[in-house]
Amino acid sequence: MSLSHLSLKYFRNIEALTLEPVNGVNIIYGENGSGKTSLLEAIYYLSHGKSFRTSKHKSIIAHQQEQFVIHGRKAIHDLSIPIGISKTQAGETNLKIQGKASRKISELAQLMPVQIITPESYSLFFGGPKERRKFLDLGLFHVEHEFFFLWQSFNKVLKQRNALLKSKPKNYFDQIKFWDKEFVRLAEQINKLRMAYISRFKQQFFDKMCAELTLIRDLEISFNAGWKESESLSDALELNFERDARQGFTSKGPHKADFSFSVAGSSVENIFSRGQLKLLLYALKVTQNSLIESETDKQSILLIDDLPSELSEDTKEKVGQLLAHCSSQIFISSILSESISAVVEPMQRELQMFHVKHGNLITR
């Protein structure tokens, strides 16, 4: 159930390139600026419909070209499903799945679960709650099909409530009371799914990762729903109504949810070393992919950009031991192919090396 084929056209510095990856581990190496990260970016784009590097699509389209095109084939059991996405300078996006046009990025995302680890991924610890909600909700999107539609519906209600809080039309208090019923109904369903998912995530995380990482044995993963556990959401909305009206936005609800990592009451970002945080990050990502695969029967993809960056040899070996628990198809970018041998050896999986130079690919 892997990505068995990838072809790019006019994607950054890549004029035209075709890749036939293996189901196991794919190492993409080359000098900085060679195009290796662009390959990971293209795979990510094929699943998410956006880049992890920029929000400006024009910077992705090759110089003096009208559009970029990405094609792939996703092997699912005995089927080979063609998928594709293109984007023009004008911002028009075209999607195709099995030769048929689609308007929903979510259909591509469901077909090909993709997670990425980059040097910026440590925002999971140091960034705001939004980064952690994104991580949590990515897993929910794949394992709970109703979550996506609940979240879309909730955001429409949230937008309506916030608009009323800002504009304050006549009788807006009564209007907000009307919307609050739907707000609470959707919010409680979202919260129920999140709590159940975190419970399953924690069980798999500690069952699989404790043997590899002694540092997580005393780790606590705590979830905050976005309102106090001791009060109902209806009460929270009522108690905070005056403040929300002054500020013009809703301060309580699942859009404010967060979860945290701590040991003996202290946040991990304050007590773990940089190397320990890196290992924790890999353990969390591997667990998420494993949970998606076990609950959906889909093989996910893990992209790792610039893996050896700042990693000691001991840390590389531990990363390899963590990745050995991962049955995902893996793509790793690196400057030097030799520098990641300590990571690859413990994994004992099919391996393919790709050398990228000036946007061109050489299979080794």
UniProtKB/Swiss-Prot annotation:
The entry's keywords: ATP-binding, Cytoplasm, DNA damage, DNA repair, DNA replication, DNA-binding, Nucleotide-binding, SOS response
Superkingdom of origin organism: Bacteria
Positions with a binding annotation for ATP: 30-37
Residue spans crossing the bilayer: none
InterPro entries recorded: DNA-binding_RecF (IPR001238), DNA-binding_RecF_CS (IPR018078), P-loop_NTPase (IPR027417), RecF/RecN/SMC_N (IPR003395), RecF_2 (IPR042174)
Compartments where located: Cytoplasm
Primary location: cytoplasm
Any single GO CC term annotated in Swiss-Prot or TrEMBL for this entry: cytoplasm
Biological processes, Gene Ontology terms: DNA replication; DNA synthesis involved in DNA repair; double-strand break repair; SOS response
Entries under SUPFAM superfamilies matching the protein: P-loop containing nucleoside triphosphate hydrolases
UniProt xrefs under HAMAP family: RecF (MF_00365)
Stated name of the protein: DNA replication and repair protein RecF
Species in which this protein is naturally found: Pseudoalteromonas translucida (strain TAC 125)
Gene that this sequence comes from: recF
